């Protein structure tokens, strides 16, 4: 693994003729950036020597900084992908440890959460799948479901334990004849949110197409009619109010990812 990482670093960054003190570089870069997401990325996302790698860029040049950050973010995505696997499971907890009330979190106020008509709702499938029929909630509710008590970890620094129930997403993808060799699965939501994940995460045994919370139909504030629950990912990677699922080889980014958040977003 060490050799792979060294090779990737050499491919991403050209040799620098100057040296810089890593801590001072980090301080100056943080001062250059106004976006909270970028500061957070520097403080929490620059792993595996990422800050040291920045010393080859001109930190007085915002464009240079942005370019370096993009390269490091992509590098982090690849490293997280290398470390990820179906046998690496997130911890599970006893129901007595559930956080009550479970916090609401979104890029809007709770009262502004979308009101989706469950009777009219149809989940749409797009992209590389054989079966593109639309799915009603009654049909989805009839599918075999499992539940999990896992920790939701927010990029903002807080966490909470909750109980989600739903259809293992890998089972659903196989049922619709999704191309499991495709690179990505992307999601479009009723609240205008969007994100995407890699296929390995989609097929992970703990990734759920969540339809319930704490034994009840998924409440509006938690993502009715469905959300993708991934305890292996940070909270912003777990889309709510899902309307469209697309299997694709085209990278589609995400709402927060397009503003600087790490795309892989592993927790």
Where do the PLM segments sit?
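N-terminal secretory signal peptides
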Residues: 1-37
């Amino acid at each position: 693994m060490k050799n792979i990482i060294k090779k990737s670093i050499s491919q991403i960054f050209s040799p620098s003729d100057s040296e810089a003190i890593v801590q001072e570089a980090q301080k100056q870069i943080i001062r250059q950036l106004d976006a909270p997401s970028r500061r957070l990325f520097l403080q929490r996302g620059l792993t595996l020597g990422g800050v040291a790698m920045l010393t080859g860029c001109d930190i007085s040049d915002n464009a240079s900084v942005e370019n370096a950050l993009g390269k490091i973010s992509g590098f982090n995505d690849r490293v997280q992908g290398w470390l990820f696997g179906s046998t690496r499971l997130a911890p599970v907890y006893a129901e007595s440890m559930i956080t009550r009330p479970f916090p609401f979190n979104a890029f809007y106020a709770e009262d502004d959460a979308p009101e989706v008509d469950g009777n009219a709702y149809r989940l749409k499938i797009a992209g590389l799948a054989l079966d593109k029929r639309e799915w009603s909630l009654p049909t989805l509710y009839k599918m075999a479901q499992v539940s999990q008590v896992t920790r939701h970890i927010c990029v903002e620094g807080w966490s909470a334990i909750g109980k989600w129930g739903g259809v293992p997403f890998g089972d659903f993808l196989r049922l619709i004849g999704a191309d499991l060799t495709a690179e990505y699965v992307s999601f479009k939501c009723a609240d205008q949110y969007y994100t995407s994940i890699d296929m390995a995460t989609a097929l992970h045994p703990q990734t759920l197409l969540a339809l319930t919370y704490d034994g009840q139909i998924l409440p509006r504030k938690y993502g009715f009619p469905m959300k993708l629950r991934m305890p292996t990912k940070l909270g912003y990677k777990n889309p709510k109010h899902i309307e469209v699922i697309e299997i694709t080889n085209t990278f589609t980014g995400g709402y927060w990812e397009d503003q600087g958040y790490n795309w892989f977003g592993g927790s």
